[in-house]
Amino acid sequence: MTDTSDRSGPLLQLLANGLGLWIRSQCDEVGELNLRLNGSALQLLRGRLVSVELMARRVTFQGLPIKHAQLRSGPLHVHLRPGLPQLQDAFQLNGDVTMLGTDLNRALLSDRWRWLGDWLAAQLMGLPTLGSLTVDNDVLLLEAPVINAGDAIRRRFRLQAAAGTVEIRHLEAEDAVQLPMDPGIQIEEARLQGGQLHLRGIASVSP
């Protein structure tokens, strides 16, 4: 678990340490975290930073396990208060996030995200409960149990980015749904590959 930053001076190092602590406080778990601050100590004294680049592995954010994230911020406004620098104002993040299909399955069956798994089962399969989710190369497989029948229904889907969110489309029908999405997040690309979900997008972050 390492934090790295541009070694342009003690002010940037102090800010890098503060940002690292803030990022970890926003996550349930962080395995590896690397930061690079783009700017100069002079800019920082004026309360400005050009951008921050972030690379993280094995992160759990709001109950969602992320294998890998590579993000870059827009310009940042920083208040150099005594002891610990503080970010001012909202800022933008853009970049890529990768999740393993097996991890996504566990998340959607967890208490925190069960509502979304069951919503998918209801919207896409007409059944109240999601049994499992599997990513088979570039295909999404959903399974839902049939109540009182001792059996399960399985359906295959593809996904893509649409209207700022993720659209899931039935392979054998015209049915499709768009995931409910935080208005501060815009998904620009969504694809399945090698048992993993890859997302690219932009998010507005409030410190």
Regions inferred by a protein language model and the residue ranges of each:
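Extended terminal
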Residues: E172, A176-P207
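Short secondary-structure junctions
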Residues: R24-L33, L124-L127, P180-G184
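Hydrophobic, proline/glycine-rich low-complexity stretches
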Residues: M1-G31, G39-L42
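N-terminal beta-strand/beta-hairpin edge segment
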Residues: R24-D103, V205
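Short beta-strand segments that buttress and anchor functional surface loops
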Residues: A56, L141-I147
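Short, exposed beta-strand/loop patches in secreted or surface proteins that constitute
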Residues: L130-V135, F157-Q160, E188-A190
